[in-house]
Amino acid sequence: MSVYDEVEIEDMTFDPDTQLFTYPCPCGDRFQISIDDMCDGEDIAVCPSCSLMIKVVYELHDLQEYYDEAGVEPPVPLVASA
């Protein structure tokens, strides 16, 4: 599978209402991926208007702050308890 680019999670925009990360696509639309898909290990964001895809670079524990921002609990624990 060929990806258009690799993008750090910090460079994406997170919408707590839709729980989607987005990033501008060259076609004018936006790549998108849901936080729950990322929690399940998915790292490919797709553009709904064209065939381009990007790889999102992140660590699983990075997602906790975005779940907190959305006011929801992750479907699985993101940080090992001590």
From Swiss-Prot:
It is found in: Cytoplasm; Nucleus. Required for the first step of diphthamide biosynthesis, a post-translational modification of histidine which occurs in elongation factor 2. DPH1 and DPH2 transfer a 3-amino-3-carboxypropyl (ACP) group from S-adenosyl-L-methionine (SAM) to a histidine residue, the reaction is assisted by a reduction system comprising KTI11/DPH3 and a NADH-dependent reductase, predominantly CBR1. Acts as an electron donor to reduce the Fe-S cluster in DPH1-DPH2 keeping the [4Fe-4S] clusters in the active and reduced state. InterPro entries: DPH3/4-like, DPH_MB_dom, DPH_MB_sf. Its cofactor is Fe(2+). Belongs to the DPH3 family. Pathway: Protein modification; peptidyl-diphthamide biosynthesis. Pfam families: Zn_ribbon_CSL (PF05207). The DPH-type metal-binding (MB) domain can also bind zinc. However, iron is the physiological binding partner as zinc binding impairs the protein electron donor function. GO terms for molecular function: 2-(3-amino-3-carboxypropyl)histidine synthase activity; ferrous iron binding; iron chaperone activity; oxidoreductase activity, acting on iron-sulfur proteins as donors; zinc ion binding. Its main location: cytoplasm. It catalyses: [3Fe-4S](1+)-[protein] + Fe(2+)-[Dph3] = [3Fe-4S](0)-[protein] + Fe(3+)-[Dph3]; 2 [3Fe-4S](0)-[protein] + 2 Fe(2+)-[Dph3] + NADH = 2 [4Fe-4S](1+)-[protein] + 2 [Dph3] + NAD(+) + H(+). Transmembrane segments: none annotated. Keywords: Cytoplasm, Iron, Metal-binding, Nucleus, Oxidoreductase. PANTHER family: DIPHTHAMIDE BIOSYNTHESIS PROTEIN 3, DPH3 HOMOLOG-RELATED. One of its GO terms (biological process) is tRNA wobble base 5-methoxycarbonylmethyl-2-thiouridinylation. One of its GO terms (cellular component) is cytosol. This is Diphthamide biosynthesis protein 3. Component of the 2-(3-amino-3-carboxypropyl)histidine synthase complex composed of DPH1, DPH2, DPH3 and a NADH-dependent reductase, predominantly CBR1. Fe cation binds at residues 25, 27, 47, 50. The keyword Cytoplasm applies. The keyword Glycoprotein does not apply. Residues 3-59 form the DPH-type MB domain.
